[in-house]
UniProtKB/Swiss-Prot annotation:
The keyword Nucleus is annotated on this UniProt entry: no
A family per Pfam: DHDPS
Stated family: Belongs to the DapA family.
Main localization of the protein described in the UniProt heading: cytoplasm
UniProt-annotated location(s): Cytoplasm
Record flagged with keyword RNA-binding: no
Superkingdom as given in the UniProt entry: Bacteria
Official protein name in the record: 4-hydroxy-tetrahydrodipicolinate synthase
UniProt pathway: Amino-acid biosynthesis; L-lysine biosynthesis via DAP pathway; (S)-tetrahydrodipicolinate from L-aspartate: step 3/4
Source organism of the structure: Syntrophotalea carbinolica (strain DSM 2380 / NBRC 103641 / GraBd1)
Lineage, uppermost ranks: Bacteria, Pseudomonadati, Thermodesulfobacteriota, Desulfuromonadia, Desulfuromonadales
Function: Catalyzes the condensation of (S)-aspartate-beta-semialdehyde [(S)-ASA] and pyruvate to 4-hydroxy-tetrahydrodipicolinate (HTPA).
UniProt-annotated catalytic positions: Y133, K161
Gene symbol of the encoding locus: dapA
Length: 293
């Protein structure tokens, strides 16, 4: 279910900082119309860290309603408190999400045994397909391949979004547990090499603004058209880099705003791009024909 070209969709806000439901619904339609296979609300790119519980539920509920079963919805429900993650995952299930994306505990930096028990507790308590999310650059700790492999045997654990940047780690999971768990790229730069090793797709940032091209590359890999996939991959590199010119999701939200897809409103502590980075972003977007020079 959670394979292919998946988007870590942005959460639009209005000028007063409120969730912009109307624009969010349009963004979802834009994604589905351009071939995106799965919508992932309330992830890192969706600024989930600045949403309160009511807003979190509202974003997921709106997403499920607008998608209307056209594609699966993988709802971000992670927390560094296990009880809170269980609560958020239960809420997502009640609202009709097809699965939950669960970031590994951040800030409190548990041991590998603690990480294992955290995810096992969620999987034991909520009968919903769950995709683990390993992103050491955000959480301050790496979930090892061994820990992921231990969790892969749980019937509710169906995937892992691997954003460690370590192809050896991803390959180890695929080699030892690929028949039990789908390994999904969490880094647009590494989607092609990870899929070449047996990964099942990407949860993409870049797909927010160029979903058709991300889908085309994933499709090319799945159809063993590696020359085509390589061409698309190399063509997208500058755009991938531009999406991380500053902290995600600032560049991608600004890019989407420049393209007229949404406003560029962020919530503190995220702020606007530095002027020189904004100029660089505009140059890249213009080069791809996404905005006028």
């Amino acid at each position: 279910m959670f394979t292919g070209s998946m988007v870590a969709i942005i959460t639009p806000f209005d000028r007063e900082g409120r969730f912009d439901e109307e624009t969010f619904r349009k963004l979802i339609d834009f994604q589905i119309e351009n071939g995106t296979d799965v919508i992932v609300p309330c992830g890192t790119t969706g600024e989930s860290a600045t949403l309160d519980h009511a807003e979190h539920k509202k974003v997921i509920k709106t997403c499920i309603e607008q998608v209307n079963k056209r594609v699966p919805v993988l709802a971000g429900t992670g927390s560094n408190a296990t009880s809170e993650a269980i609560e958020l995952t239960r809420d997502a299930k009640k609202m009709g999400a097809d699965g939950a994306l669960l970031i590994s505990p951040y800030y409190n930096k548990p041991s590998q045994e603690g990480v294992y028990r955290h995810f096992k507790a969620i999987a034991d308590n909520v009968a919903l397909p769950q995709v683990l999310y390993n992103v050491p650059g955000r959480t301050g700790m790496n979930m090892t391949a061994a820990t992921t492999i231990r969790l892969a045997s749980h019937p509710n654990v169906v995937g892992i979004k691997e954003a460690s940047g370590d192809l050896t780690q991803a390959s180890t999971i695929i080699a030892e547990a690929g028949d039990q768990i789908n390994v999904i790229s969490g880094d647009d730069f590494l989607t092609l090499p990870m899929m070449a090793c047996g990964g099942k797709g990407v949860i993409s940032v870049t797909a927010n603004i160029l979903p058709g091209e991300v889908k085309a590359m994933v499709t090319a890999v799945n159809e063993n058209r590696y020359a085509d996939a390589k061409k698309i991959h190399l063509n997208l590199l500058n755009l991938h880099q531009a999406m991380f010119i500053e902290t995600n999701p600032v560049p991608v939200k600004v890019a989407a705003a420049l393209m007229g897809l949404c406003g560029d409103h962020l919530r503190l502590p995220l702020v606007e791009l530095l002027p020189e980075n904004l100029a660089s972003l505009k140059k890249v977007l213009s080069g791809y024909g996404l905005i006028q020079a």
